Amino acid sequence: MLGQYYYHEILRKTIIAFGTIFNDIHIRHRDGAGKETSDMRVPLAYGPMQKFLARLEQQPDLNRAVQITLPRMSFETTNIAYDATRKGGITQTFKASDGSKLRKVFMPVPYNVGFELNILVKLNDDALQIVEQILPYFQPSFNVTVDLVNVIGEKRDIPIVLDNISFQDDYEGDFATRRALIYTLNFTAKTYLFGPVSDSSEGLIKKVQVDYYASVDTENARRELRYSATPLSLIHI
């Protein structure tokens, strides 16, 4: 049974959709008079937090251009797990038409994809600005629309649930040591995985016709009335 190639890019699309949520967050700095002095878009990259911490430790000279390294955000996938609470019928098939033929695929399988979003900053106020722009949208979930299977036009709203928030201050050493405050937000994306899509042997219904007769003898009786209908989608093809 295994070995039939197919690739809907569902996990990849889910990762991209998650990152898109946080790719336009800004922080602003003000002087003592309350005048805005800077507006910075926070960089976002896919990768583990340890990668960025190692770079800060190995290249302390980057402190001369703080905006290049901090603040910044990173995210990564932490786990993929089956979600039995959203389980549907196993033997049912999902059917869709592209206008010329009918396609079918078995009902999707629910999976949860875990994400970790790390916010690395030098100043705690920067972290608070970023976190406050994120939290109000998650109550505790935020829906994103993902085109799961292009060939059948299957789009679904994927809830992304905020699970928990943690904080740590990775500052150890003397005053010359680079400080990094880290806020970690854990999320769960409730997505669906589809199997291979195949052509349905049932064919596409292009026209429906119903005849009414005045007698049960349909061969000899005169037809009294005929109704016919063409699906709206076929009229516009």
Listing of model-derived features with the role each one plays in the protein:
Residues 71-79, 107-123, 132-134, 179-192:
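Oligomerization/assembly interface segments of phage tail-like spikes and tubes
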Residues 41-50, 57, 83, 94-107, ...:
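Membrane-lipid interaction segments
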Residues 2-9, 13, 80-81, 102-112, ...:
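Extracellular/virion structural assembly segments
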Residues 235-237:
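Conserved small/polar residues in nucleotide/adenosyl-binding loops
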Residues 91-94, 132-141, 204-208:
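Amphipathic alpha-helical scaffolding segments
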Residues 84-88, 195-201:
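Short conserved micro-motifs at the rims of enzyme active sites and ligand-binding pockets
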Residues 1-92:
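Small/polar-rich, solvent-exposed N-terminal microdomains that initiate assembly or binding
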Residues 107-109, 129, 138-197, 204, ...:
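Acidic-leaning, charged glycine-interspersed low-complexity segments
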